[in-house]
């Protein structure tokens, strides 16, 4: 399996790639669901998968600099979802750290639960960010990658 700038090439089913803005989140959810079906995801897994994808994509377009790029492909029996934006997290390791057996974070503010939800649904969630912080975050990039079982 060959690699490219986005990671492993899909095995058999070509990747789907779309730019997402706040106004296009609904269309992105529909595309993700159709892609998951086309790539062989068990139908009962699709609703939760779309919830996780929506949470990460919504974060990208509301906290990063829109538009965000949503990419979906198949790799070794998993559905792989990558969301990239032009934002910068100071410490992306905090996104994937933590005890998933802990209760849902109870904050007295709206929001703040999307990453926790996505981490509990996905098989894996990784996040990384790049920026020349010595100069500015103008060239920053954040990538969140989720893997979901197809069956």
Model-based region annotation:
Residues 1-15, 61-151:
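Conserved beta-strand-loop-beta-strand hairpin that lines the nucleotide-binding pocket
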Residues 27, 48, 117:
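Charged catalytic carboxylate motif
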Residues 52, 57-62:
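Short, well-structured hydrophobic secondary-structure segments
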Residues 15-30:
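STAS-typified acidic loop motif
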Residues 30-54, 107:
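Conserved short strand/loop->alpha-helix "switch" segment adjacent to the catalytic nucleotide/phosphoryl-transfer site
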